[in-house]
Amino acid sequence: PEATEAPADDTPVGYEVGMKCPDFTAPLYGEEGGEFTLSAQKGKVTVINFWATWCTPCVAELPYFAELYAEYGDEIALVAIHSNLVTDDVDKFLAKENLDMPFALDKTGAVIKSLGGSTQLPMTVIVDADGKIVYNKVGSVTLTVLEGLVAPLLAE
């Protein structure tokens, strides 16, 4: 029998649940030259949170992401992307908060726009190990919600 090519993944690319998440790269905060690239996380459940220091609900939910990362960090990829052009306030905020998780910057707003976001924050996107969006929400989340979404994906 002749070898045949595997069919191409024809999943539509976009930001709706069920679509293949658009690839993006964002510079990691505090790591000179470090980058978070979605395609480099292939095979891992990836949790992406968009936030800003001026957004009260964003700041309130960041500890949940830090707890999720502490619990599942070896098994998942997680990044909290600051959606703002100004980084001075990020420096001050992260210096006083004790949040042990990766942070990145979206200085131009291109990353959040590519995932369908606007000026509304917070926004959370969860991508499964195959790169498909399984959760996309503008608004606050809780640790219980995050664990309830991530744990079943890791069990697959």
Residues of each region from the PLM?
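N-terminal targeting signals for export/organelle localization
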Residues: 1-23, 156
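A short beta-strand-turn-helix
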Residues: 15-16, 24-46
